[in-house]
Amino acid sequence: MAQNSSLIAAELEALRQTIRAHEYAYYVLEAPNIADSEFDALMQKLRALEAASGLPIPADSPTQRVGGKADNRFRNVAHHIAMLSLDNVFNADEFADFYRRLQEQLSPTTAISLIAEPKFDGLAINLRYENGILQRASTRGDGITGEDVTQNVRTISTIPLRLNTHTPPDVIEIRGEIYMPKKAFYALNEQAAANGEKIFANPRNAASGSLRQLDPRITARRQLAFFAYGYGEITNYQLPETYEALLEQYRAWHIPVCSLHQKAATLPEALAAYQQFAKQREQLPFDIDGVVFKVNRFADQQRAGFLARAPRWAIAWKFPALEKTTRIEAIELQVGRTGAVTPVARLQPVTIAGVVVRSASLHNAREIARKDIRVGDTIFIRRAGDVIPEVVSVVLEKRLPDAPVFAMPEHCPVCAAAIVQNEDEAVARCSGGLHCPAQRVAALIHFASREALDIRGLGEKLIQQLVAQEFVRTPADLFCLTADDWASLPRMGKKSAHNVMTAIDAAKKTTLARFIYALGIRGVGSVNAQALAAHFGDLAAFMAADRAALQEIEGIGDVVAADIEHFFADEDNRAVIAAIVAAGVHWSTELTKKIIDAPLLGKTVVITGTLPSLSRAEAQKRLETLGAKVTSQVSRQTDFLLLGADAGSKLARAQAFSVPIIDEAQLQTWWQHYGNAV
């Protein structure tokens, strides 16, 4: 019986190997060596044999690509080694500067060997293989933590569930890009349009949306593909000497690798490679938005090192934004939190690089005058960096003879208050302050934001309703709303009303730094707010400070000091602050005074690993309360590394930079001494 089981197991494994070889030939090499009907017959045979054998079906069997129930969420997973992004350049001069910096650092007298490859426009992914078997796939996320999308990635036919080798590494994380080929994208949108469903703006969005489907069977139908271009954690595997050799190793393992990469041994060769990719761009079967250049030798990569969020040994040279022509149908004005009145062009919809553009900021009246932009004009528009719509110029030959010259109105379009403009500022501003509904909404959104009072559940739509119903004029009014007020809002149930009231009540307990930031003083971001709180230690002292006293603080220049002084000179602002404090918003003055002497004040801290009792969010909040700035990457500017269990590459980098290491116990000690008044 045991012998029969062994024979059956061997037969099953041989059949699986045969099918894997055919999958690789079909999906990766695009050179099928059997007919579709023959492949289907092999799959049917494998399913039947697996069912009849009674043996456990391994996770890497070709029959296990699609299946499983729909999930209602994606689990967050921490990357063992951070997934860094790349710095960008946008022209030959900037690229030449990058190349010269590398040459000075690595080899002043000889050329540097680079690899040029397409910058794929998709979704970065980390594939973790353990003993050759795909165990987990996770998105980049914020570079530190991503989402577990393993079940969906298993449905992508170009990604092997098992590496094609008898001697796989114990662990290897293969990094690359999941993308949607243009052909699949067009077919998907055609089908969606025929069904009356929402269409995707571009292949990148389609790839991202398809990968994050809760039902893996939907992902399986979306024809996603993958290219490898890097690595993460590796155990029991010796990297080859060059990146080019690693790609060859991936290819041998049946990991898809783009064949378009090319060597560039000199700066002129690198410039030529960029031009070649730019010419090929439109003809490629997948979207690219630039060219990535990497140092070929891994030893040279290690010597070049890393910046805070990107490697020094690689750069992404983005393509110039694609330009199209369209027509300006109207110029509307938007009013922001600080009263800035921004003209916005409403455009005849135009598709640029797969994205429908309907509007573009014109920034200010001076910019409109400089470009002589008028309603009715035909204009060239591009997506700067392939992202932000930008009006480049006007096609004067197509201008209508009666096209009116734009003039900034004298009064705010929202509240009718006077629009004012300082001579030294390009931005015009509404003088209405919190009397202006548009400024009121923006100020309330800022006040409730995560870095300010962090009022959970109080979003833009809810704030707009409160302002429209005239329940709220200033942030102080939020703390006076009753259950009846909340219940009277459209679609506001009792539970939702209770939740938001609870969140508002919880937000009363805050820190002086958060409160200062929440006030929305022009030029005072979260970092400046922390510095101001630490310096003055008391709200009254901060409000009484003159411009000279403010400028003693690092980061507070003459302009910001003047803005702070102007803010507190307004009696309405002072009245709102008094009302907020009277409503119960408070912080520990003793804590703020203690923090001035705290060892973490003004320090940069990185967290790595799993802490014994605190979550990462809790630890970060305590660090920030104690005056620290928490960042995600270790650099020479890092002051402390907060170390937990199962730390990744950050520990090694911290040791290389001689960064002092602290643990949760040390943080708890500081918290007990400096922060327990919160």
Curated annotation (Swiss-Prot):
GO terms for biological process: DNA repair; DNA replication. One of its GO terms (cellular component) is cytosol. Residues 595-678 form the BRCT domain. PROSITE patterns: BRCT, DNA_LIGASE_N1, DNA_LIGASE_N2. Keywords: DNA damage, DNA repair, DNA replication, Ligase, Magnesium, Manganese, Metal-binding, NAD, Zinc. Zn(2+) binds at C412, C415, C430, C436. It catalyses: NAD(+) + (deoxyribonucleotide)n-3'-hydroxyl + 5'-phospho-(deoxyribonucleotide)m = (deoxyribonucleotide)n+m + AMP + beta-nicotinamide D-nucleotide. The active site is at K119 (n6-amp-lysine intermediate). CDD domains: BRCT_DNA_ligase_like, LIGANc. Its cofactor is Mg(2+); Mn(2+). It is an enzyme of class 6 (ligase). It comes from the Bacteria. GO terms for molecular function: DNA binding; DNA ligase (NAD+) activity; metal ion binding. NAD(+) binds at D36, S37, E38, F39, D40, S85, L86, E117, R140, E177, K294, K318. Pfam families: BRCT, DNA_ligase_aden, DNA_ligase_OB, DNA_ligase_ZBD, HHH_2, HHH_5. Its EC number is 6.5.1.2. Coiled coil: none annotated. Belongs to the NAD-dependent DNA ligase family. LigA subfamily. PANTHER family: CHROMOSOME TRANSMISSION FIDELITY FACTOR 18, DNA LIGASE. DNA ligase that catalyzes the formation of phosphodiester linkages between 5'-phosphoryl and 3'-hydroxyl groups in double-stranded DNA using NAD as a coenzyme and as the energy source for the reaction. It is essential for DNA replication and repair of damaged DNA. This is DNA ligase. It comes from Dichelobacter nodosus (strain VCS1703A).
